[in-house]
């Protein structure tokens, strides 16, 4: 790793399977390390920050406990100065909408990327327009997540809320 040229736009995402291995590698290389699968809870991110264990975190909405928990994790990462990838392990149009919304709440200097997970599945679950302007993705400006669920695919709602 240390023979890579300095300044190379390259990171190691989840390079090792254990905490100990990641921390050991972090101390032996100047290549930035992004944690994801081992950073699922607030406590994990706090521990990584306290040990100077990374340059960034991959926030996976479903694995990390949903949008509310990811918001708190995002705040910890911003306080630690970490770059973040906002993603999910797999996705749908609805999951993608949530990813985009969370990604938009990050200060741009901390946003590494937003993963477009829509191509990971064959079934389209919702419709919505997502614009890319100057390299940045933006969510629809309509209510909620900004997408219209395809009820012919998902079935009728079990419960709905109205104003």
Regions found by a protein language model. Give the residues of each.
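Non-cysteine beta-strand/loop elements that form the S-adenosyl-L-methionine
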Residues: 14
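Alpha/beta enzyme core
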Residues: 1-11
């Amino acid at each position: 790793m240390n023979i890579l040229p300095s300044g190379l736009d390259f990171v190691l995402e989840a390079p090792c399977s254990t905490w100990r291995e990641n921390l050991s590698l972090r101390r032996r290389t100047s290549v930035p390390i992004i944690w994801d699968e081992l950073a699922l809870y607030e406590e994990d991110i706090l521990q990584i920050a306290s040990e100077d264990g990374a340059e960034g975190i991959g926030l996976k909405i479903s694995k990390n406990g949903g949008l509310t928990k990811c918001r708190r994790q995002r705040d910890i990462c911003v306080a630690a100065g970490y770059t973040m990838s906002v993603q999910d392990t797999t996705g749908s149009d609805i999951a993608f909408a949530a990813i985009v919304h969370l990604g938009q709440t990050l200060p741009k200097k901390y946003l590494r990327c937003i993963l477009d997970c829509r191509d990971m599945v064959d079934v389209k679950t919702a419709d919505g327009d997502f614009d890319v302007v100057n390299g940045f993705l933006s969510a629809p400006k309509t209510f909620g997540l900004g997408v219209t669920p395809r009820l012919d695919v998902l079935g009728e709602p079990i419960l709905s809320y109205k104003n």
